[in-house]
C-alpha cells in the first residue's frame, strides 16, 4: 500500500443544491472528456484532508497550493490515512505527462496522474473550479468523471514589462491566474527601446541607465502633434534574486518562464548604457520615451557578440527554460546600410544584403545558445534571409511565417495578431480605456484554431502551441494589466487545452458566467463587457428601416435600454430590434436576477436619408476598417482616437455617387474628415454637392471650402456641413478634394496627404 498523506472531510453540509449540483460542471478550459452525474454531489465541510503520494514530484508545492485554494473558502486541511481520505491523489504512471483523471462521487474525490506532478496540479484546478466561489465551508461539489489531457504542449501568455515595468508581486499574481486555467509558459519581454528590466552583474549600466527614462508619452504616438509627455520619470528592474523567486514560484505551479532579450533591434535602452555596441550613428543614445521602431540596433562586431553572449550566459543561468527568446523582430537596416563595418562584413561573408546579415546574426547567437543546451525562439522575421537550423518560430504577422516554418520542419508557436494580441481593444474603442488599436473581442480569441488547414497532418505536428501576447505600451498599472488579460486569457486557455471539436462558444459563455464569480472573489480587475450590452446597427432592406440589435455575451440575462436617456430608472426591457428613423443615442445595461452586472453602455446612430444607401467611390477606398462596402452610410460616425469607423483614400480628388432609397428633397450634407498629422491624414479642402434625378445628369447645388483650426495639437474629427436650398434628388454626387500636400512644420511636410472620411449624412 502506498504511503500517503491524507485528506478527509470531518463535517458535512446540509445546504440545498447550488447551480453546479444540478448537472453542471463549469470548468475552464473544458475537459476533453467529461461526464456529469446530475443531482449527485460531494459535500464539503469545514475541514478537509487529502492523501498525496510521497513519491510525487513537487508534492510539497501541490499540498501548499491546494491548502491555499481551499482556505479561500474557509475550509481547513488535515492529513489522515488513504482509506479515510475524501480527496485522494493516486499515482498512475500509465497516464501521459500533464494528463489527469478526476472522479467525484458523493463519498470522495480521486485525482489520478503520473508522478511527474503536472497532471495532479491540473486535476486540482478542475476540482477547485467545481467548488462554488461563494461557498463558505459548506461547498457542494458536482459529481463528475473526467479524463483529460491538453491539446497542445505549449500553452503560453506573454507580458511586456520593458515598455512599462510591472512589479514582482504583479508578475506573481499573473502567474497564479495563469495557473488556475492550466497555462504553462510565461514569456516575459524583458528588454526593449523603452527599458531594460533584468539585472546583469557583469554590465551594471544596463539597469543603472537602461532601466530608467525621464518621462513617458501620453496617448498614442500618432495622436498629439507634437507628442505629449507626462514628465514623470519611470524606472524599475528585477534583481537576480527577484528572478529566482519568480522562476521558483512559477515552477511550483508548473509554469516555465521564458525570458526575451531583444536583438538585434529594439535595443535603444541597452545602447544608451553601452553605445560602443552600436554602429555609431554619431548621436546620443537614450532610453526611448515614446513608442516607435527606432534605428538603434546592435552592430554585428566581435565585441557586440562578446557582450551579448555574456548577457545571455547570466540569463540562461537564471532561467531553467529550454527556450531563450531572442526577439529578432522589426529590425531596421538603416544603420547597417551606412555602417562601413557592416558593409565590409556583408562582403566578407558573401551575403546578399542586410536581411542575410540579420540571418547570419541570428545563426551565430543560436549556435551559442545551443552550446549551452538550450534553443532559441524568435519572432517570424527570423525567417528572412534564412532560418537558423534549430530555431522555433513565433508567428505573429499572421500565420504565413508559421506555415512556412512548419513546412521546413521547425517547431512553431502560433500567435497571430488577429487572434492572439490581447493588447488590442476588447470593447468599443470609442469608450474603452486606451489600447494600442485594432479590435479583438473575447469571442474572436475563442474562435482561433492554431492548426492551419493548409498544413498536412504531419506538418501540423510542428505547431507545438499558441500564445496570447500582452504588449505593454499602454499598460501602466497592475489593474490595467488584468483588465486587458481577463477574461480573454480564459478563452485562450481553452484554445490551448481543449480539442477543437469539443469547443462551443455558447457553452463557454455559460461556464465563464460561473467563473466570473471566482474572478470577482479574487479581486481580478477583469473587463466587464461580458456583462454589458453591445449595439449592432444596420439597414434592413426588407423592412426599409434602420434597426439596432442589442446583445450580451452573458447567458440568461436581461437587457434594458432607453432612447436618448441615460436615466436607468427609465430603461425598458429589450425584446426585439429597435427601429430608428432619426439620429438617436441608445443607452443600455445588462441585468441578472434584477441586478445590473456591468456598466451602462451607449452608442449614437446618425440615421439620415443616406443611411443604408448604396454608393460607389472613384477611386476606390484604399482602406476600410468596418462594414466594407457601406462604411460611409452605416449610420456610425468616426472619432479621433481610432480609425475604426473611417474610410481612407490616397488620391487627392474623390467622387462619391450615392443612390438614395427614393426620390426626396434635401437641403444639407454632412460628413466628418479626419486630421491626424502623424499619419499624413489632412482634412478635405473642398466639398462639392451635386444632385440628379436619373443618375446621369447632375447639377451642382453647393460647394464649400471649409476652414480648420490647425493650431490644435491633437488628432481631430472636423465636421463639415454643406447647406443649400431645398432640392429634389434621387441621386447625390459628392466631389471631395483632399488636403493636398502635408503642411510645412508638420510630419511629412510637402508629401501627398491621405483623406479619411467617416459618414455621409444627407438631410
State the predicted function of each range:
Residues 376-391, 397-547:
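Flexible, acidic glycine-rich loops studded with aromatic residues
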Residues 20-154, 480, 496-518, 522:
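Contiguous, structured surface segment used for ligand recognition
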Residues 1-25:
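Bacterial Sec-dependent N-terminal signal peptides
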Residues 95-323, 364, 368, 467-472:
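Feature activates predominantly on carbohydrate-active enzymes
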Residues 639-702, 716-763:
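Aromatic, loop-rich ligand-recognition surfaces of beta-strand-rich domains
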Residues 700-710:
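Solvent-exposed serine/threonine-rich low-complexity stretches and specific carbohydrate-binding patches
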Residues 288-289, 294-389, 396-404:
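Active-site neighborhood of glycoside hydrolase catalytic domains
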Residues 51, 499, 503-658, 665, ...:
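Short, compositionally stereotyped local motifs that mark structural "simplifiers"
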Amino acid at each position: 500500500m502506498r504511503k500517503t498523506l491524507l485528506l478527509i472531510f470531518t463535517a458535512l453540509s446540509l445546504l440545498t443544491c447550488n447551480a453546479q449540483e444540478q448537472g453542471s460542471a463549469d470548468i475552464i478550459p473544458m475537459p476533453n472528456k467529461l461526464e456529469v452525474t446530475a443531482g449527485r454531489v460531494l459535500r464539503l465541510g469545514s475541514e478537509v484532508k487529502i492523501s498525496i503520494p510521497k513519491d510525487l514530484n513537487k508534492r510539497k508545492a501541490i499540498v501548499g497550493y491546494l491548502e491555499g485554494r481551499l482556505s479561500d473558502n474557509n475550509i481547513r486541511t488535515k492529513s489522515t490515512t488513504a482509506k479515510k481520505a475524501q480527496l485522494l491523489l493516486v499515482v498512475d504512471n500509465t497516464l501521459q505527462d500533464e494528463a489527469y483523471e478526476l472522479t467525484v462521487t458523493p463519498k470522495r474525490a480521486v485525482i489520478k496522474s503520473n508522478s511527474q506532478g503536472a497532471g495532479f496540479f491540473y486535476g486540482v484546478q478542475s476540482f477547485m473550479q467545481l467548488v462554488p466561489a461563494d461557498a463558505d465551508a459548506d461547498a457542494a461539489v458536482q459529481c463528475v468523471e473526467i479524463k483529460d489531457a491538453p491539446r497542445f504542449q505549449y500553452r503560453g501568455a506573454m507580458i511586456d514589462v520593458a515598455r512599462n515595468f510591472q512589479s514582482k508581486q504583479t508578475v506573481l499574481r499573473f502567474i497564479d491566474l495563469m495557473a488556475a486555467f492550466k497555462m504553462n509558459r510565461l514569456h516575459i519581454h524583458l528588454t526593449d527601446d523603452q527599458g531594460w528590466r533584468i539585472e546583469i552583474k557583469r554590465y551594471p549600466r544596463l539597469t543603472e541607465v537602461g532601466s530608467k527614462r525621464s518621462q513617458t508619452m501620453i496617448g498614442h504616438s500618432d495622436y498629439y502633434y507634437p507628442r505629449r509627455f507626462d514628465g514623470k520619470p519611470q524606472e524599475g528592474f528585477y534583481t537576480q534574486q527577484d528572478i529566482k523567486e519568480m522562476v521558483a514560484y512559477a515552477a511550483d505551479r508548473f509554469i516555465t518562464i521564458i525570458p526575451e532579450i531583444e536583438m538585434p533591434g529594439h535595443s535603444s535602452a541597452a545602447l544608451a548604457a553601452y553605445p560602443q555596441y552600436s554602429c555609431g550613428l554619431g548621436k546620443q543614445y537614450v532610453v526611448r520615451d515614446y513608442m516607435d521602431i527606432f534605428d538603434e540596433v546592435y552592430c554585428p562586431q566581435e565585441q557586440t557578440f562578446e557582450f551579448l553572449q555574456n548577457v545571455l550566459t547570466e540569463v540562461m543561468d537564471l532561467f531553467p527554460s529550454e527556450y531563450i527568446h531572442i526577439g529578432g523582430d522589426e529590425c531596421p537596416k538603416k544603420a547597417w546600410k551606412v555602417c562601413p563595418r557592416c558593409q565590409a562584413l556583408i562582403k566578407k561573408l558573401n551575403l546578399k544584403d542586410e536581411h542575410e546579415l540579420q540571418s547570419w546574426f541570428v545563426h551565430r547567437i543560436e549556435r551559442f545558445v545551443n552550446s549551452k543546451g538550450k534553443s532559441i525562439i524568435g519572432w517570424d522575421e527570423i525567417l528572412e534571409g534564412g532560418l537558423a537550423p534549430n530555431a522555433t518560430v513565433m508567428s505573429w504577422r499572421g500565420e504565413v511565417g508559421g506555415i512556412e516554418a512548419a513546412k521546413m520542419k521547425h517547431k512553431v508557436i502560433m500567435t497571430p495578431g488577429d487572434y492572439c494580441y490581447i493588447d488590442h481593444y476588447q470593447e468599443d474603442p470609442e469608450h474603452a480605456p486606451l489600447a494600442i488599436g485594432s479590435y479583438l473581442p473575447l469571442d474572436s480569441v475563442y474562435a482561433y484554431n492554431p492548426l492551419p488547414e493548409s498544413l498536412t497532418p504531419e506538418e501540423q505536428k510542428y505547431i507545438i502551441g499558441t500564445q496570447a501576447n500582452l504588449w505593454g505600451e499602454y499598460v501602466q498599472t497592475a489593474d490595467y494589466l488584468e483588465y486587458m488579460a481577463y477574461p480573454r486569457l480564459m478563452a485562450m486557455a481553452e484554445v490551448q487545452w481543449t480539442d477543437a471539436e469539443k469547443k462551443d462558444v455558447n457553452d463557454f459563455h455559460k461556464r465563464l458566467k460561473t467563473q466570473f464569480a471566482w474572478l470577482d472573489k479574487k479581486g481580478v480587475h477583469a473587463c466587464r463587457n461580458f456583462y454589458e450590452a453591445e449595439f449592432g446597427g444596420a439597414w434592413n432592406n426588407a423592412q426599409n428601416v434602420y434597426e439596432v440589435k442589442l446583445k450580451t455575451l452573458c447567458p440568461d440575462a436581461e437587457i434594458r435600454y432607453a432612447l436618448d436617456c441615460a436615466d436607468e430608472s427609465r430603461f425598458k426591457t429589450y425584446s426585439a430590434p429597435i427601429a430608428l428613423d432619426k439620429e438617436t443615442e441608445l443607452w443600455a445595461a445588462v441585468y441578472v436576477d434584477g441586478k445590473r452586472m456591468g456598466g451602462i453602455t451607449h452608442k449614437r446612430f446618425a440615421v439620415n436619408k443616406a443611411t443604408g444607401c448604396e454608393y460607389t467611390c472613384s477611386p476606390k477606398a484604399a482602406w476600410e476598417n468596418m462594414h466594407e462596402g457601406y462604411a460611409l452610410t452605416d449610420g456610425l460616425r468616426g472619432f479621433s482616437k481610432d480609425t475604426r469607423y473611417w474610410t481612407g483614400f490616397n488620391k487627392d480628388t474623390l467622387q462619391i455617387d450615392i443612390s438614395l432609397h427614393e426620390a426626396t428633397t434635401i437641403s444639407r450634407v454632412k460628413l466628418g474628415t479626419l486630421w491626424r498629422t502623424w499619419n499624413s491624414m489632412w482634412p478635405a479642402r473642398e466639398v462639392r454637392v451635386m444632385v440628379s434625378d436619373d443618375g446621369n445628369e447632375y447639377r451642382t447645388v453647393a460647394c464649400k471650402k471649409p476652414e480648420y483650426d490647425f493650431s490644435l495639437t491633437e488628432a481631430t474629427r472636423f465636421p463639415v456641413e454643406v447647406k443649400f436650398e431645398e432640392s429634389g434628388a434621387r441621386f447625390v454626387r459628392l466631389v471631395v478634394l483632399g488636403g493636398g500636400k502635408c503642411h510645412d512644420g508638420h510630419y511629412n511636410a510637402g508629401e501627398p496627404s491621405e483623406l479619411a472620411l467617416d459618414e455621409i449624412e444627407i438631410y
